[in-house]
Amino acid sequence: MLVWSWRKWPDVLVDFGHQIYTAWRLSTGAVLYTDTDYLMGPLSPYWNALLFRVFGPSFMTLAVANIVLVAILLVLLYRLLARVGRPPATVSACLAFVTLFAFGQLVGYGNFNFIAPYSHDLTHGVLLSVAAIFCLARYHSRSQVRWMAAAGLAIGLLFLTKVEVFVAGSAAAITGLVLTLWVERPGRRRLLRLVGAFVAAAAAPPLVTFGLFSLAMPARRALTQPLGHWRAALRGDIAALPFYGEGMGVGDVGASVWALLAATFGYALILGPAAVLGLMLRKPGRHRPALAGTTFVLVAAGLGLQWRGIAWLEAARPLPLFMLALGLVTLVAFVRRRRDPATAHPLVLRICLIVFALALLLKMVLNTRIYHYGFALAMPATLLLVVALLDWVPGALDRTGGYGPVFAAAGSAALLVAVVAHLSVVDTYFRGKTLMVGRGADAFYADARGAFVNTALEQLRIRAEPGRTLAVLPEGAMINFLARRVNPSPYFHLMPVEIILHGEDHIVAAFQARPADYLMLVHKDTSEYGARFFGRDYGRKIYAWLEANYHPIVVIGPRPLQNDSFGMLLLQRNEGRP
């Protein structure tokens, strides 16, 4: 997957450019939230900035660092899943992570992978959450307070990322802490040590962050931006945007519920007969492995022959139901076995992982998917489903006197065809990335929009003297990074969310205070937010100010923000007219 996807991970204009540009600016001394706007916590941008300071700013610096983090995450996932499942299921789940989530592309835009993500806050948050649960597992093995403190430290760092992953990771860690203490039943002194170590370690990263940012901004502001980034998630006017309603599946609840039930029925149709057969095969004999093999062939052939007619991208919709069912069954088993640490601790870890997976799915509870945001939000649930299909459910059938491998065979066949079907989608998008954008360590493959970006970079080299500043609106900070041109305003990403949060008057004032020498308008249809074009359907005051203060000098392709045609427009500030 790494070789196949090499340099094809990012989107040429959307989201990831925001990430890499912010890291570059911070690596040169800019202050987050003051010199450059940011809606999430400060951990990820400063981590990426540190990488740029040490290894130099480039796309490949960030990509290689993220490949290393993916390897670390893979090891942690394997170690954790190995504690709650048998090796075949664990290996299969890890292969699912590599093939479906880590490197691929299942929608038109890149960015929804762990190498060039739309938000490092999310991918780093997933890693920190898994690390916290892993530290809890180490505590189960060694009973050392330092591992409880390490889990708390991971949660403290997690607070500095993104709100949804913090909620999920902290819910999982706190659940694990409570259940672990229930099993251990420590004395008062040890209880205080364990809880105190966890809480103190969790508090350290936010306190250090507050202290450092207080050196660069008023203390009140340090509380509301680096440490108060979660407040945007509570804004009702933002939550009401169609983008988030559709993403959660509440735009049309009836249709979403129907799609969920239809997908659930599909699972029952495929796996139900295998479960019944497994319950019926109670007598040992050679016929049982033969039937398991036959089941694998029949399911694989049946799905494979009609795979093009199956809505594979809808297959993740029942994940919340599956996680809820697995959680209830595991909780009952834990309550029954809580007095035996040897059997209770694996159940605690299983519950932690299920809580983490289920909490991550809340953002798309009625529209669960492994594409788009699902590359991270649905990843834990998908991996747990793999383990359940190949180990937990077959094990339950074995314990009832049945034959679990026949169910595992059906599950394996379905998973194999599903992975191949998803990889065919990845192949379609990768084949469309044939244009190289950028040079040297900044180079990556892009779709047809890459030709426009290359032309824009060439025009900037021809027309703009070195050191001249550039604003790319409403989105396209990747151009700033590739051209190494600073946007002097903090606001370089003007989607409807940013304009709701900051207000047009405030943004116009910021542009007036620090205007860019050049402006590039890039076509972007934002209909998913309920307003199609910047300057026409939203951001009118900002656009009017731009029109009054800049004049066009070159059009690249069709004029942007007019219709369905993609194009760019380069403008120069009026004061700079020759």
Positions of PLM-derived features:
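Membrane-lumen/periplasm interface segments of specific transmembrane helices
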Residues: 195-268, 362, 419-421
